[in-house]
Amino acid sequence: MSGLFLSKGLFPQEFFRPTVEFLLRAQQADGSIPWFDGGHCDPWDHVESAMGLSIGGEYGAAENAYRWLKNTQLEDGSWWAAYRAGEVDNRERRETNFVAYIATGIWHHYLITQNKTFLRE
């Protein structure tokens, strides 16, 4: 292999398009991306979905996904374990370990888009 697994242009966009289309259909108006229609959303898997949108060239949708995370982050820096239909779905625990993965997703988006304005947001 002569490049990173997901180096730009390594795979044709048609390869990813069905997944990207699924993510676009699943994404809610508030930017959250549940596991499936009517399912819950957890920040970890949500970031994976946002990364898929970035890879698929859907930068606006990916940025909306990251804005949802910004808007739902709790004062102590954590997130609830799960959300559903815009509400907290699991108040039994909060997750601080999501922070590193969310930062990774945002960095990934920046590496693809070079959008410094988004980083400053």
Q: Which residues fall in each region the model found?
A:
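Low-complexity, Ser/Thr/Pro/Gly-enriched N-terminal "stalk/linker" regions
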Residues: M1-W44, I55-W68, T72-W79
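Aromatic-rich carbohydrate-recognition surfaces in CAZymes
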Residues: D42-H46, L53-A62, Y66-E121
